[in-house]
Every structure is written in C-alpha cells, then in structure tokens.
C-alpha cells in the first residue's frame, strides 16, 4: 500500500458515523432491553415523551443513548415496527454496532426489503465543501447503477425511498458550480421540487440514495440505499454484521474520495464487465488488504463478469 492510499484510509476512518437499521419481528421495548443487556448497563426506558416516535432507549457504558423508534414504513404490527438509531459513532465503534445487531437478530429481529426495511448511513459532513459535495453527487451518479446491481436493490424502494440523483440537480449543480453552502442548498431544493419546508424532517428531497437534505439540516451526508439480503434456499438473509460493516466502509470511502479529488464526472462507468468495474473502483476507494476483504466480497459477489480481466479471459 502506498503512502497516498494509507493516508486516504486513515482520513476516511476519522469521519463520524450514524446508522439507522430498520427491522421488524421484535418490539422496540424488547430491542432496547437486549441492547441494555449487551452494553452491560441494564438501563433502558420509554423515552417517547422526549423523542417521539414511540421510542424506547438504551444506554451504553459511555452514557450514549441508542434509540429504537417506530417507523410506519416498516411492514408488520405497529408494536414491531422498530428502527435502531445509533448515537454518533467512530470507526472503532463499528464492532460494537455489529455485535448489537447480532444480538438483536438472535432475539428475533428481521430486516430485508420485503419487510419494508432498509439501512441508512450518515457520515459527518465536517470537512465537506460545496465542491466536495458536488464531487460526491457526480461520483454517486456515475456509480449508482453499478451499486444497485451489486446490492440487488429493491426496485420499489428505489422508486420511492432511495431514488437516484435527480438529473435536474446534477445538471444545475454542474452548470452553476456553487461556491457557498447556501447556494448549493438552493440548487438542491429547487431542482428536487422541494423548496417548501426546508427545515422539515420529511422534506421530499430526502428520498434519494444520496440525501443532502440531511447535510443542510443535521450536518451529515446520508446514504439511504442499503438493505440486507432476502432469504433464499442457500442463505438465511436478514441482518448480517459483515454486510453492515461493508456498507459503512463504502460510505466512509465515498465521502473521503469526494474530499480528495479535485473534480468528478457524472458519466456512468463501463458496464460490459460489472465485476471488473466494481473491483477496480473499490481499489481506488482504498479497499486494499484483509481489512476490506469482506467488503470486496459483498460488493462484487452479485455482479457478472471477471474481476481480473476487463474483456474476459482469453480462450485456452
């Protein structure tokens, strides 16, 4: 690994993280109790009066509040519509989050697109500028189809809750080249037809794979596109700790790349060999070595093609 890549990975890991995992088949009270037991604090309580959303909360040993909230978009009985909302995390907290998700799964929690469940990942917007966020929009636009294929994204979710970058936003942001966050916000909301209620949580502009509404209202860059695999004859599907870590690493890397590059193009990647395209892109993102082996596997396993040869292997 060269010095530039090592620095890229180190800076990537310095970003803050927030994660939302939607699930059902477990009540919010039960999920909070499981979390409190795992944290070793035993502290959990109903915090709906303060947090709304029929919330139950659990606290870890550092006094951080982990929330389990009701989200009406989740399928199933109301008492089992459960969304885990983490406190602000660092890279070193990922293993804690992974083990908590394992504990929730062992206690019956289920999550996949057929249940109306997704995974949303927030990366702290510190260090981002109008130019870096423009870069990020272009990076996403050029890779969204590849990512959707790699993750087998549910098409109904893509049409409603995690749409691709709006072409009107893409055209305007690249033509007008905003130099201030206020100007970027104006372009974001007007091009998405959502100038009303900019401060409202449920502003319609949020329903994109890349959600900059969160940037302007919460100080984070939100990636809303993720989901766990649905069960098959070969796999159990559902909540998977390794898959979750892979998603977090990808979001961190995307955010860092947007900061590092001078400009980025929205032109779609080659698609004659998707597996090769994904592998080479992941290497540019810094996914090198054993630490990123699981992510490389999850992000290429569903793609067709050859990871080693762009135009396929020569016949013997």
Predicted regions located by residue number:
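C-terminal accessory/tail domains of diverse enzymes
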Residues: 1-113, 126-316
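Short, conserved phosphate-binding/catalytic loop or strand-edge motifs used
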Residues: 115-123
């Amino acid at each position: 690994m060269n010095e530039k890549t090592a620095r890229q990975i180190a800076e990537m890991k310095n970003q803050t993280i927030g994660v939302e995992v939607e699930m059902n088949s477990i009540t919010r009270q039960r999920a909070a109790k499981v979390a409190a037991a795992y944290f070793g604090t035993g502290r959990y309580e109903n915090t709906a009066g303060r947090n709304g959303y029929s919330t139950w909360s659990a606290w870890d040993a550092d006094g951080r509040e982990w929330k389990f909230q009701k989200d009406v978009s989740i399928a199933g009985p109301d008492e089992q519509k459960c969304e885990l909302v983490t406190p602000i995390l660092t890279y070193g907290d990922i293993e804690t989050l992974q083990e908590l998700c394992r504990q929730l799964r062992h206690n019956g929690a289920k999550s996949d697109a057929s249940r109306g469940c997704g995974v949303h990942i927030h990366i702290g917007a510190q260090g981002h500028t109008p130019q870096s966020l423009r870069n990020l929009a272009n990076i996403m636009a050029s890779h969204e189809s590849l990512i959707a294929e790699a993750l087998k994204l549910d098409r109904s979710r893509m049409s409603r809750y995690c749409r691709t970058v709006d072409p009107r936003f893409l055209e305007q942001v690249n033509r007008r080249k905003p130099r201030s966050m206020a100007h970027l916000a104006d372009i974001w909301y007007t091009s998405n037809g959502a100038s009303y209620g900019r401060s409202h949580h449920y502003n319609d502009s949020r329903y994109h794979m890349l959600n900059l509404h969160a940037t302007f209202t919460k100080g984070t860059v939100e990636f809303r596109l993720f989901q766990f695999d649905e069960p098959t004859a070969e796999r159990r599907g559902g909540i998977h700790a390794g898959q979750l870590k892979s998603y977090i690493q990808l979001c961190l890397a995307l955010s860092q790349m947007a900061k590092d590059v001078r400009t980025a193009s929205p032109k779609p990647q080659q698609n004659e060999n998707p597996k090769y395209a994904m592998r080479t892109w992941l290497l540019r993102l810094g996914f090198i070595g054993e630490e990123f082996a699981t992510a490389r596997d999850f992000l290429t396993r569903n793609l067709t093609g050859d990871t080693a040869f762009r135009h396929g292997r020569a016949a013997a």
